[in-house]
Amino acid sequence: PREGRRLRAAGTAAGRDRRRKRTENRRYGHLAKERGVWYHRTAENHSTNAKGDSRMAKELTAGELAERSLITKYRKTIWNRLIGGCKDYELIQPNDRIAVCISGGKDSMLLAKCMQHLQKYSDFPFEVEYLVMDPGYSPPNRELIEQNARTLELPIRIFESPIFGVVDEVEGGSPCYLCARMRRGYLYKEAQALGCNKIALGHHFNDVIETTLMSMLYGAEIKTMLPKLHSTNFTGMELIRPLYLVREEDIISWGQYNHLRFLQCACRFTERTESHEEDSARREMKQLIAEMKRHNKNVDINIFRSMHNVNLATAVGYRLGDDDELHSFLEKYNEKEKM
């Protein structure tokens, strides 16, 4: 009888072990394959055993823990959405060489860590450079960027540009707009010199819907922030936005969970300029969206989807690009009348 009890106990334990492995394989095996994505993890790398997790937490560095949190705690809210965006908008192709542009803020730091992890486990090869431009940061701000890069184990390349000095000498206009335009040009140039064919920026879901509303309410036009676009000044270069589907609240949560402190706006012009048009307008859009969500919780996703479902037949006027002339609905209207 005693031997029988031992055999039954062993059988029960083996059964539990088999069930646990099946659960782990369902949870971690070929993560995001539902989207047909070229990324996979195996159950052996992600034990859900509590003791194993505790032991692993003691052995992992802060950078490794931050990376691991992407495919555990933030798997649904950040990782799967990044993978979905890369797949849906065809952002990354085999043998790409991508410069992840790091400003020091929460968005670009998260993007860099995501791209680092993705490169390790992608089913096809691509290369990543981690590019930091110093436009004239104060020593404490630059040190914070370098410290976060060390913590997250990101092999950054830092290059300097005179942007802050140039913008400081320009009178009139928007310093923020000029700075942003110059930044992108310098980033394209440096990335191209490194042999990259793409730069990756940290714009996210909230940036997209806020930009859409800003264009309507302040620009008197309907346009949005695209998930990728070709450079008009640097031949063969593209810009991609892998965080296109990731929400800002989840990015903030990831940073707090990993005890990270990121650079806020490091521009010295914020201290002496009373009103920054874009920052002010963007804050208004955030408040407007939050107010509308009190009455309709799907407002943000509906704004986002509206730009994926534009019906030109109902537009009074439209252009097919920045260089195109303005077309009127009357062009087609009068043609139908002649028919």
Task: Enumerate the language-model features and the residues they cover.
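Catalytic subdomain that performs nucleotidyl-dependent activation
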Residues: 127-128, 207-288
